[in-house]
Amino acid sequence: IFGHELPLTVTQMLWVNLIMDTFAAGALASLPPNKEVMKDKPRKNEAFIVTPPMRNQILWIGLAFVAFLMGLLYYFTNAEGEINRHDLACFFTIFVMLQFWNLFNAKAFATGKSAFNGLLHDTGFITVALLIIIGQFFIVTFGGDVFRTVPLSWQDWLLIIGSTSLVLWIGEIFRLFGKKKK
């Protein structure tokens, strides 16, 4: 849509797939059982695993991410229809950080509690979160031609981490004002 070069490379998508399908699944699986789940009525055998609230959250967050990322590609594209390597590294990191913060929203989904609730005791979750951040830093800093990245400045990192964390803070606001009613 915005030129000839894809905004994410195959190796970058492999990293995203690894952190979201493997690491994130491990992080969420490492969480202690939620005692509130046992208070819910059993679901029918033919009921979908993805509930309507879950579907809606996936849909709206997905649409918001796509709109934001498409706008970002437009913003980064120069007059010749190209995006420089620095901006591509920023785009890649923004993409990963959006997923990273949304992992915290997934942790808190349908609990009616903050994503920070019990976080200090969720060592598996914290370990995976740190692994994702550290892995992303090393890939962007040292990935070079393999990952089509250039090192980002600490200002870039602060801006990306701060701005993408809005995903978490917006989720926290929704959880605060939309407490689960029993």
What are these regions (language model features)?
Residues 56-69, 94-98, 123-140, 162-165:
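Hydrophobic membrane-spanning alpha-helices of multi-pass integral membrane proteins
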Residues 15, 92, 153-167:
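Small-residue-rich transmembrane alpha-helices that serve as helix-helix interface/gating elements
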Residues 1-5, 74, 78-79, 137-153:
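Transmembrane helix-loop junctions at the membrane interface of multipass transporters and ion channels
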Residues 9, 124, 151, 159-160:
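Hydrophobic alpha-helical segments characteristic of transmembrane helices
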Residues 173-182:
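Membrane-interface capping segments at transmembrane-helix boundaries
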Residues 1-111:
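Membrane-embedded transport module
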